[in-house]
Each structure stands twice: as C-alpha cells, then as structure tokens.
C-alpha cells in the first residue's frame, strides 16, 4: 500500500514536470473556476493582512507589542500566567498629568487642579480605548481568525487535492493506463472539482456575514469616538471654568527676601550688621583663586556604578523579539525584573529582556532584586 502511494506521488511529480518543462497539455478548467480561484487567493491575502493591520491600528506602538510578546513567551516558558496589557498613550499621559498635578498641590494652584482634571479625562478615554480593543477583538478579529483557520483552510485543502487528482488523471491518460484506472482517476478528479467549486462559491458568496463584521467594526469606532467626544466636551467646559477662576484671582505681590531676612550673620560672608562689606587689611596676602572641590565635582556627576547594573558573563544572542543581545563583559543597566529568571535592561542605547544566568549583578535594583 505504501509502495502504491509512493508510485502515485512519483507519477504526479512526473506529470507536473512534463507540463512545465516538456510542454505537455494538462486538463484545462473553465474561466469561471479560474476566476473563483483568483478571488479566493485574494481573500486569503486579505484576511491575513486585515488581521495584522487591525492589530497595528489598535496597538500602534511596535516596541510595546514586542515587549508584550516577549513577556508572554517568557511567561509560557516559566509556566507563570502573567497579565500584560497594552499601555494606551492616553493612559500614559493621564498618569503624567495626575502625578505632577498632585505634586504641585491642588489646594493653592489652579494649574494643578486643571492638570488633575485633564488627567482624569484622559484616564476615562484610555478605559474607553480598552473597551474598543475588546469589542474589535471579539466581534471582528475572532471571526476573521475562525474564517482563516476553518473555511479558508478547508477550501485550500480541496484545491490542493484537486490539483493532485488532476495530475494523476492526466498522467494515466498520457501513459494510456487501463480503462478502469483512468475511469477511477477521473471519478476522483470530478469529486474534488465539485468540492473545490462549492467551497469557493460558498466562501465568495457570503457577503452578508462579511459586511456585517465591517458594520460592527464601524459601530465600535463610532461609539469610541462619541464617548471620547463627550469626555472632551466636559473637560473643555471644566478647563474654561478653571481659566476664568485663574483670571479672577487677585495677583499676589511678591517681595524677594534678603540675607538679613533669613537671619544670616555676616561672619562668613563678609557682611556686617548694616549690610556693608567688612574691611580687608592691605597687608594681607591675596587670596588664592577659587577652585572647585573634588567632592563637589563628584556630586554633580554621579558614578555609573550607583545605577542598578550588571556585568555580562557570556555572550547572549537574542532569539525572540524584545530580547537584548550583548557581549561578554558588557556593563548592562538594570531597568526591571520580569521574574525569577529574566531581567529587563539597557546597553548601547538598546533595551530588552535577558536571562539572569548570563550576568553577574554589581549594583542591585532598589527593591533588592
């Protein structure tokens, strides 16, 4: 049985080469079938490209996507389920505004209050964006993936089988095999032709479902932008009120303080009680030129070793997106600890993940890791 199958594969390969190299004529299918094949091939490319571009549309930062993929891969290898969400730009900007608005102090600064209001609004927009992501993934990307893995895969399987049976049928005819062999090959060829035609027709005539998915996508985008517009409208009104409040506040007068106001005596600064410079003896030797203290110079530029860092024990060549490659003895700045076995770090202007076993920590991270 295995020999018969091998012989059939050899015959099909021989027929294929005879058609390509020897100019032999194979069975030609009609123009309608060839047009369905062309449209099916375009659909295969469309579904693949549409999924890719939709994911890029929802998560446009390639570095963030690479980090998420790397963390997901590391979590699978370590057997730890680690949740990792895409950092929405609205959320990052919101965190910045909220942090510094609170540091400025909301009690005495209208600007600080406005920053906090802006940050809260951006935070709401980030939540709306997460809802959009979930909606698109569930109602648009998942149906496309199902279509790719089931419908398209099945149609392409029937087409591949049709090509093989067509070659087998033409080979038997060309070699003038027995009538029953030719008839059996023809029956299988006809069966595959029927399955391939029906599969492609059903795929291409399913416009209602495909357009419905596009409608769902458009509705999700419309809801997202409508909710964001509502948030921004409320924010605009609030900021207008804050501006009016800032304009109506009386301007505080400010008088800079002198050294006397700060209760500093004149002993070390060359000042006497009335604020006039003290007299210096003419016989006194001139003072040397002022020089910068080495200790102060050291304080201005902190040593690199004060930063969390490690030294590479071996060369590490990255195998996955998001990993950081380095050479032996490289000094790597530590940024974060992913888990018990992996660090996130930076070297030579590049950032990424690398295994702990390849390095020796010289200055640990602040949390003791």
From Swiss-Prot:
Composition-biased stretches (Low complexity): 275-294
Residue ranges of domain BAR in the record: 18-248
Keywords assigned by UniProt, alphabetized: Coiled coil, Cytoplasm, Endocytosis, Membrane, Phosphoprotein, SH3 domain
Domain of life of the organism encoding this protein: Eukaryota
GO CC annotations, alphabetized: cytoplasm; glutamatergic synapse; membrane; presynapse
Gene Ontology terms describing biological process: regulation of synapse structure or activity; synaptic vesicle endocytosis; synaptic vesicle uncoating
UniProt keyword annotation of Cytoplasm present: yes
Database matches in PROSITE patterns: BAR, SH3
Region (Disordered): 275-296
Domain SH3: 305-364
Alphabetical list of Pfam families matching this protein: BAR, SH3_1
Membrane-protein topology: Peripheral membrane protein
Compartment(s): Cytoplasm; Membrane
Coiled-coil parts of chain: 227-247
Family to which this protein belongs: Belongs to the endophilin family.
Summary of the function given for this chain in its UniProt record: Required presynaptically at the neuromuscular junction. Implicated in synaptic vesicle endocytosis.
PANTHER family registered for this protein in UniProt: ENDOPHILIN-A (PTHR14167:SF81), SH3 DOMAIN-CONTAINING (PTHR14167)
Name under which the protein is recorded: Endophilin-A
Organism of this sequence: Drosophila pseudoobscura pseudoobscura
Primary gene name: EndoA
């Amino acid at each position: 049985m295995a020999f018969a199958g091998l012989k059939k594969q050899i015959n099909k390969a021989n027929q294929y080469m005879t058609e390509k190299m020897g100019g032999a004529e194979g069975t030609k299918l009609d123009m309608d079938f060839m047009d369905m094949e062309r449209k099916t091939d375009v659909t295969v490319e469309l579904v693949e490209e549409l999924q890719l571009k939709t994911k890029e549309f929802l998560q446009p930062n390639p570095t963030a996507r690479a980090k998420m993929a790397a963390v997901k891969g590391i979590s699978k290898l370590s057997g730890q389920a680690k949740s990792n969400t895409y950092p929405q730009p609205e959320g990052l900007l919101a965190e910045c505004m909220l942090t510094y608005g609170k540091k400025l102090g909301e009690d005495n600064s209208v600007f600080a209050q406005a920053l906090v209001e802006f940050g809260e609004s951006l935070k709401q927009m980030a939540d709306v964006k997460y809802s959009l992501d979930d909606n698109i993934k569930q109602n648009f990307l998942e149906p496309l993936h199902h279509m790719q893995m089931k419908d398209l895969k099945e149609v392409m399987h029937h087409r591949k089988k049709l090509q093989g049976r067509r070659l087998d049928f033409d080979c038997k005819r060309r070699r003038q095999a027995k009538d029953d062999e030719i008839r059996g090959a023809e029956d299988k060829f006809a069966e595959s032709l029927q399955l391939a035609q029906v599969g492609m027709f059903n795929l291409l005539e399913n416009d209602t479902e495909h357009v419905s998915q596009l409608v769902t996508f458009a509705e999700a985008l419309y809801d997202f932008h409508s909710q964001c517009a509502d948030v921004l409208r409320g924010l605009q009104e609030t900021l207008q009120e804050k501006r009016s409040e800032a304009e109506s506040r009386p301007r505080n007068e400010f008088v800079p303080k002198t050294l006397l106001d700060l209760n500093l005596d004149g002993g070390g600064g060359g000042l006497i009680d009335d604020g006039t410079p003290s007299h210096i003896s003419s016989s006194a030797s001139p003072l040397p030129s002022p020089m910068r203290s080495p200790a102060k110079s050291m304080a201005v530029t902190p040593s690199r070793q004060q930063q969390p860092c490690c030294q590479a024990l071996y060369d590490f060549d990255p195998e996955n997106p998001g990993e950081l490659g380095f050479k032996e003895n490289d000094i790597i700045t530590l940024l974060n600890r992913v888990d018990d076995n992996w660090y996130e770090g930076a070297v030579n202007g590049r950032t990424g993940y690398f295994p702990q076993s390849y390095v020796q920590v010289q200055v640990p991270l602040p949390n003791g890791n």
